[in-house]
Amino acid sequence: MNREGAPGKSPEEMYIQQKVRVLLMLRKMGSNLTASEEEFLRTYAGVVSSQLSQLPQHSIDQGAEDVVMAFSRSETEDRRQ
């Protein structure tokens, strides 16, 4: 996770944003989320909708390792901006 933070975002906001991204990626890779994880996504629906548009577009049958690497690259690009 990003320890450097982003200008204008609190550590809690960064945590929520990153957790939403991770949960969405897990769901996209076919993982079953727990009830508490699904509730977290419902609670932060606004963050979910903004993150969905930023997720890398990959086919569902793509290997999990490739999806994680794409996610890592997008995280690195986000930090550079």
Swiss-Prot record:
What does the record note on quaternary structure?
Binds CTNNB1.
Q: List residues, modification Phosphoserine.
A: S59
Annotated family: Belongs to the CTNNBIP1 family.
Question: What organism is recorded for this protein?
Answer: Mus musculus
- An MF annotation (GO) of this entry: transcription regulator inhibitor activity
Which gene is annotated as encoding this protein in its UniProt record? Ctnnbip1
Q: Where in the cell is it found?
A: Cytoplasm; Nucleus
Kindly provide the name given to this protein in its UniProt entry.
Beta-catenin-interacting protein 1
Keyword Phosphoprotein included in the entry's annotation = yes
Q: Which UniProt keywords apply?
A: Cytoplasm, Nucleus, Phosphoprotein, Wnt signaling pathway
Lineage, top-rank taxon, reads Eukaryota
Tell me where it mainly resides. Answer: cytoplasm
Give the protein's biological function: Prevents the interaction between CTNNB1 and TCF family members, and acts as a negative regulator of the Wnt signaling pathway.
GO CC annotations on file: beta-catenin destruction complex; beta-catenin-ICAT complex; cytoplasm; cytosol; nucleus
Q: Which GO terms describe its biological process?
A: anterior/posterior pattern specification; branching involved in ureteric bud morphogenesis; negative regulation of canonical Wnt signaling pathway; negative regulation of mesenchymal cell proliferation; negative regulation of protein-containing complex assembly; negative regulation of smooth muscle cell proliferation; negative regulation of transcription by RNA polymerase II; negative regulation of transcription initiation by RNA polymerase II
